[in-house]
Amino acid sequence: MDEFYKEALGQAKKSLSEGGIPIGSVLVYQNKIIGKGHNRRVQDGSVILHGEMDALERANRQPASVYKESIIYTTLSPCPMCTGAILLYGIPKVVVGENTNFMGAEDLLREKGVEVTVLHDPESIQMMKDFIQEKPELWNEDIGE
């Protein structure tokens, strides 16, 4: 398993251990993590801090050129909100742990020229499946249902 994806998975586990939704993400620039985060909606009472949004936030302000040369790793297929941020900042590549439990806006990313790689990671699939079964109300809230 790729070291960067491992860190994203570690962030997802951290969120779960905090009572949150197990989704993690890292933003990588020039082979270094510049931002890492996890879904903090439950922990912080936030309406927007999905894993990808938290990783972007924790990367702090960057010049546009940094985003245009970065890769974002996420344990779950990006929702429309996170997809919008990826497109807004021109991030050219997204590595997705799994899209079995939730298919985000991958088609839109591809349509806009973003390279999307799906790992079909069994650990991520099982972790999300278990979470959705155990806390369907939190999951539905997270995806706007």
What would you call each of these model-derived segments?
Residues 43-53:
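A short, polar/charged loop-to-alpha-helix boundary motif
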